[in-house]
Amino acid sequence: MKKRKGLLIILDGLGDRPIKEFGGKTPLEYAKTPNMDKLAKLGILGQQDPIKPGQPAGSDTAHLSIFGYDPYKVYRGRGFLEALGVGLDLDEDDLAFRVNFATIENGIITDRRAGRISTEEAHELAKAIQENVKLPVDFIFVGATGHRAVLVLKGMAKGYRVGENDPHEAGKPPHRFTWEDEESKRVAEILEEFVRQAHEVLERHPINEKRRKEGKPVANYLLIRGAGTYPDIPMKFTEQWKVRAGAVIAVSLVKGVARAIGFDVYTPEGATGEYNTDEMAKAKKTVELLKEYDFVFLHFKPTDAAGHDNNPKLKAEMIEKADRMIGYIIEHINLEDVVIAITGDHSTPCEVMNHSGDPVPLLIVGGGVRPDHTESFGERECMRGGLGRIRGHDIVPVMMDLMNRSEKFGA
């Protein structure tokens, strides 16, 4: 029995809702996607719910679920995964947080992403904060991808029951950090002091002085959320399925998830996780890894960002960019030897500007797949696909079965 290889492609935030200016089509339906449409005709379509129907999923919990883990059991907060993703070496008693560089004016958050500052700017600002902020505990503060950063409070894991200061929408003041016990109260007090000192550092930083002169939103505030400790992973993905697994990822959170479950992670030069990401660099690296690994995971972020920015046209353009990436890959592999799944980790409808509980389009193609009669890859066509509506949790088992790598249950 021939064992095939697997390629899981996640177009982050792929799913959407009908857009009036597109004549009622979604960005995926509106975009020109000849390569994914070709695969749709050769494969089988369906929909998947990352967690459960109607439940908006975070990128962290969604990816854990899609890789076959129950997020209700293993998830311990986003922050630790972000920290793993930026390559930090952490101890089990550390407490980590996801941080956004944001813009505050007169006590009101006016931009939760500081005009989507660049990764380079974020890293420079984070360095200044690390060097100038003084706290009663040891801490690590580093830039991640784009407007994102990671904060680690060393030895403070017992204080994980702490709230956040992120209001989750512009036009509101930041929250005060809440707590549930004495340990988390101390963490809340440390975070308040950290944010206060960081604000002072950011206000006078040359990067923000330059952004002010250019009329851009300044990154003068920190929004902190997602307190996390080490995830409770019962068995690595690589151990469970007895495969060598590699991943092509630019975004720190998703890198962290992949590393936590045993993937070797690669970020080719030019892969930024932003709108300017080099999709061909990611495609070429994916083809290269398929020669070496049994299972490859390819993550593409910009589709999600456009949904958060309520920009349907840009989302369609990013989907077309992803389609070119996929086109290169299928030109350089033998589909009979590989099982490919293409989906999103969740839906990010432009009208919502956030994750929603809408089901996500799913396409599976390659050796062993029984094609249905669908013609293109889009939300409505996926509704009539042969896969039906499945749990995100089921995607990898379906792939592994088609790859002839699953084991029989029973005699």
From Swiss-Prot:
Q: Keyword set for this entry?
A: Glycolysis, Isomerase
- Indicate yes or no for the key word Isomerase: yes
Q: What EC numbers are recorded for this enzyme?
A: 5.4.2.12
**What GO MF annotations does this protein's record show?**
metal ion binding; phosphoglycerate mutase activity
Biological or metabolic pathway of the protein: Carbohydrate degradation; glycolysis; pyruvate from D-glyceraldehyde 3-phosphate: step 3/5
Cysteine disulfide partners in this protein: none
Write down the Pfam families for this protein, in alphabetical order.
Answer: Metalloenzyme (PF01676), PhosphMutase (PF10143)
Q: Which SUPFAM superfamilies match?
A: Alkaline phosphatase-like
Reaction(s) catalysed by this chain's protein: (2R)-2-phosphoglycerate = (2R)-3-phosphoglycerate
UniProt key word Isomerase: yes
Enumerate the Gene Ontology biological process terms. Answer: glycolytic process
Q: What does this protein do?
A: Catalyzes the interconversion of 2-phosphoglycerate and 3-phosphoglycerate.
Q: Give the family from UniProt.
A: Belongs to the BPG-independent phosphoglycerate mutase family. A-PGAM subfamily.
The record's listing under PANTHER family reads: COFACTOR-INDEPENDENT PHOSPHOGLYCERATE MUTASE (PTHR31209), METALLOENZYME DOMAIN-CONTAINING PROTEIN (PTHR31209:SF0)
Return the protein name.
2,3-bisphosphoglycerate-independent phosphoglycerate mutase
Per the UniProt record, the source organism is: Thermococcus gammatolerans (strain DSM 15229 / JCM 11827 / EJ3)
